[in-house]
C-alpha cells in the first residue's frame, strides 16, 4: 500500500503547509489567545481540507493511470509530472500566503480578486518599494519555494522505492501477489475499487462535506471577532473563490453617460433624510425590541391581505388588520440570498449577481443589525437550515450580528423535522426561549428568524389544505399564529416591534411569472405591543425600504443606506418599486409599469409611457447600482 501512504503523505503535506501559513500570518499580524488559536485552526480546517483535496486529486488520478501503464518511460514522466506540478502549485500558493499575510495588516481583509485591480500598473511596485527591496524579496521567495519544493519532492521516496513511477510498479506487484493471487484483472479491480474510494473521499473534502452547501468562505466563520474569522479562512481558497466570482460590474448596464445617469438617479430621491411629523410615528417608543421574521417565499399570491387565498393565511391577515400594513410593497428579487441582502442592507438586487456570494463586497454593506448594535442592541440571527448556504453566515457575522445560529446549533432530534432542517413550528419555540433569555439580560435586542418550511418539496407536519404547496404556507401561518399568541401573553410584548415580510414572491398559481407584477407583490406587516395603532400604508415601496423606514422611526441615522428610503418621511415624495431577475428589470410608479427584457433588449410589457420616462429611470437606476456594487471593497 505504498501508493496509498504516498497519497496520504502528500495530502497531509498540503495541510501542514496551510498550518504553517497560519503561523506566519499570526506572527506578522498578531497571535490570538491559546484557546482562540485552536478554534481558528479547527474552524478553518474544512477549507484547508478542500484545497488539499483539490491539489491531491490530479496526483490521485495520475497514480491510478500509472497502475495500467508501467514502463520506464512512464516512471520518468511520472517523476517529472510530480515535480513540475508541485513546484508550480507551491509557487502560486506560497505567493498567495505571503501576500495575504502582508496586506492584511493594511487592508483588514483576506487577499481576493480585488488585489488584481491594483496590478494595472506593475511598474509602480519597484518605484514605490525600491529596486533593492524587490530584488531581495524575489531572491528570498525563490529560495523559500526551492526549499519547500525539495521537501515535497522527497515525499514519493521510501526506503525501498526511489521514485513515484517505481512505487507504482512495486505496488502493482504487491497487490498482484498478496491481494489477487496472480490474477491480472482481479488485481486491476482491487486497485480500481481502492482508488475509487479514495476519489470519493477527495470529492467530499473538495465539496466541504455532505451538507447542502458546498465549500465557501462563509462556512468557516464562527466568531463576532472578524480577525478570528479571517484567520480561519484559507487564503488560497479565498483568492480563487473570489476570482471565480469576480466580474467587472462597472461595465454592466451602461446606458448613459455617468453624469446623465447620476442626474436621472438623483431624481428618484433615494437616500433622503427622515423628516417625520407626529402623525408619521408608528411606534410608542423609539427603542423597542425588534423581531424581524423573514418568511420563505411567502409572496402576496398566497396571502389573503394582499391578493391571495384568504383560506391560507388567516393569522397573517389578522396581523395586517390589527397592525401596520404596507399594502403596496414589492420584492426586489426572486431568490433568498438576494432578498436577504435587500431586506437587511437596503441594497438592490441584480439580474446576474448575488452580492451575498461575494464576501469581499457583502461584508462592507450597512445593515439593520449593525445600526442597532451601534446603539446598544444585542443581535441574533436564527435559521433552521444550513447557515453556510450562499455565504449567509459570513454576511450576517460581518454586518453586525453577535450570534448566527443554524441547524447544527439546535437539538439533533429537531434537525430533520423538515427536508431543509428544523421546521418552522419548532423554530418558533426556540425563538421564544431565546427571547426569554434576552429579556433577562436587561438590554434591547434585535432578533431575526428566517423560516424554511414553505419551500419545495412542501413537506410539513401539518395537514389543513389539499393543495400541498398552499398547505406549506398554511403551516407557516399556523406556526406564526401560535408564536404570536404565546408571545402576546408575556411582558416583553409591550415593548416589541415585530416586522414580517417574505424574502421574495412565489410562483402560484403555476402559470404566473416575472412578467406579472403580482408575483412579487408581497405583504409587509408591523405588529407587536410597540405599534401605536393599526394603519394601512398604501404607498408604493420596496423591501429595500424596510431598513431606512425602521431606522427613521427609531431616530437612527440611515445615510449609509444609499438605496433605502424612509416610506413614512415627508421627503418620500416619489413612490416607486423596482424588481430584477435574470431576464429583466421591472419599474413601477404611479404612472404604470415598465418591464425591460434583457434578452431582447426591449420593453416586453408596459402601460402607456409615451416618453419612455420609466424605462429611462430603471436603466439609470441599474447603471448606478452596478457601478456602486463594483466599487464595494
Go through each PLM region and give its residues.
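Residues that form generic nucleotide/phosphate-binding pockets
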Residues: 44, 48, 128, 154-155, ...
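Short alpha-helical linear motifs
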Residues: 63-65, 473, 587
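Soluble catalytic regions of membrane-associated enzymes that act on cell-envelope
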Residues: 209-562, 571-575, 581-582
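Membrane-interface soluble catalytic domains
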Residues: 174, 215, 530-633
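Exposed alpha-helical structural elements
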Residues: 3, 36, 76, 124, ...
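Transmembrane and membrane-interface helices of multi-pass
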Residues: 2-248
Amino acid at each position: 500500500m505504498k501508493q496509498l501512504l504516498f497519497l496520504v503523505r502528500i495530502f497531509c503535506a498540503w495541510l501542514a503547509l496551510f498550518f504553517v501559513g497560519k503561523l506566519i500570518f499570526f506572527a506578522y499580524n498578531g497571535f490570538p489567545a491559546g484557546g482562540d488559536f485552536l478554534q481558528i485552526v479547527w474552524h478553518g480546517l474544512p477549507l484547508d481540507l478542500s484545497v488539499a483535496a483539490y491539489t491531491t486529486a490530479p496526483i490521485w488520478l495520475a497514480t491510478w493511470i500509472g497502475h495500467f501503464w508501467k514502463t520506464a518511460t512512464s516512471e520518468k514522466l511520472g517523476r517529472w509530472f510530480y515535480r513540475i506540478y508541485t513546484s508550480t502549485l507551491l509557487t502560486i500558493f506560497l505567493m498567495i500566503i505571503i501576500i495575504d499575510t502582508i496586506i492584511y495588516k493594511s487592508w483588514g481583509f483576506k487577499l481576493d480578486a480585488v488585489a488584481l485591480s491594483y496590478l494595472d500598473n506593475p511598474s509602480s511596485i519597484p518605484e514605490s518599494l525600491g529596486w533593492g527591496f524587490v530584488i531581495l524579496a524575489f531572491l528570498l521567495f525563490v529560495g523559500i519555494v526551492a526549499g519547500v519544493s525539495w521537501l515535497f519532492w522527497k515525499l514519493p521516496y521510501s526506503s525501498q522505492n526511489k521514485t513515484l513511477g517505481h512505487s507504482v510498479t512495486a505496488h502493482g506487484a504487491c497487490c498482484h501477489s498478496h491481494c489477487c493471487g496472480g490474477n491480472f484483472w482481479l488485481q486491476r479491480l482491487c486497485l480500481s475499487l481502492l482508488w475509487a474510494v479514495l476519489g470519493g473521499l477527495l470529492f467530499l473534502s473538495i465539496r466541504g462535506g455532505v451538507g447542502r452547501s458546498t465549500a465557501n468562505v462563509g462556512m468557516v466563520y464562527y466568531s463576532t471577532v472578524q480577525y478570528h474569522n479571517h484567520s480561519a479562512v484559507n487564503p488560497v481558497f479565498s483568492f480563487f473563490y473570489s476570482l471565480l466570482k469576480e466580474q467587472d460590474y462597472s461595465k454592466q448596464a451602461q446606458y448613459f453617460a455617468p453624469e446623465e445617469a447620476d442626474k436621472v438617479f438623483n431624481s428618484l430621491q433615494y437616500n433622503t433624510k427622515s423628516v417625520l411629523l407626529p402623525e408619521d410615528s408608528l411606534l410608542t417608543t423609539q427603542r423597542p425590541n425588534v423581531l424581524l421574521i423573514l418568511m420563505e417565499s411567502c409572496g402576496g399570491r398566497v396571502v389573503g391581505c394582499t391578493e391571495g387565498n384568504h383560506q391560507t393565511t388567516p393569522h397573517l391577515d389578522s396581523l395586517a388588520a390589527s397592525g401596520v400594513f404596507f399594502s403596496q410593497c414589492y420584492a426586489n428579487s426572486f431568490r433568498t440570498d438576494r432578498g436577504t441582502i435587500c431586506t437587511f442592507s437596503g441594497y438592490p438586487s441584480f439580474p446576474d449577481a448575488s452580492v451575498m456570494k461575494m464576501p469581499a463586497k457583502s461584508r462592507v454593506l450597512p445593515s439593520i443589525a449593525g445600526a442597532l448594535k451601534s446603539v446598544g442592541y444585542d443581535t441574533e440571527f436564527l435559521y433552521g437550515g444550513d447557515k453556510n448556504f450562499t455565504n449567509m453566515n459570513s454576511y450576517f457575522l460581518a454586518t453586525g450580528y453577535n450570534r448566527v445560529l443554524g441547524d447544527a446549533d439546535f437539538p439533533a432530534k429537531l434537525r430533520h423535522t423538515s427536508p431543509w432542517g428544523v421546521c418552522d413550528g419548532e423554530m418558533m419555540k426556540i425563538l421564544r426561549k431565546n427571547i426569554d433569555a434576552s429579556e433577562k439580560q436587561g438590554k434591547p435586542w434585535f432578533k431575526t428568524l428566517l423560516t424554511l418550511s414553505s419551500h419545495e418539496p412542501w413537506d410539513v407536519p401539518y395537514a389543513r389544505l389539499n393543495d400541498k404547496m398552499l398547505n406549506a404556507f398554511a403551516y407557516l401561518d399556523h406556526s406564526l399564529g401560535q408564536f404570536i399568541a404565546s408571545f402576546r401573553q408575556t411582558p416583553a410584548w409591550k415593548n416589541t416591534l415585530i416586522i414580517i415580510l417574505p424574502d421574495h414572491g412565489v410562483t402560484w398559481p403555476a402559470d404566473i411569472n416575472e412578467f406579472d407584477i403580482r408575483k412579487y407583490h408581497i405583504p409587509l406587516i408591523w405588529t407587536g405591543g410597540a405599534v401605536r395603532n393599526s394603519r394601512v400604508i398604501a404607498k408604493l415601496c420596496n423591501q429595500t425600504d424596510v431598513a431606512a423606514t425602521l431606522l427613521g422611526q427609531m431616530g437612527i441615522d440611515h445615510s449609509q443606506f444609499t438605496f433605502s428610503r424612509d416610506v413614512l418621511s415627508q421627503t418620500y415624495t416619489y413612490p416607486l418599486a423596482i424588481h430584477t431577475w435574470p431576464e429583466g428589470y421591472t419599474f413601477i410608479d404611479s404612472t404604470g409599469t415598465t418591464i425591460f427584457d434583457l434578452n431582447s433588449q426591449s420593453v416586453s410589457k408596459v402601460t402607456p409611457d409615451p416618453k419612455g420616462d420609466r424605462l429611462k429611470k430603471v436603466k439609470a437606476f441599474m447603471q448606478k447600482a452596478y457601478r456602486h456594487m463594483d466599487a464595494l471593497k
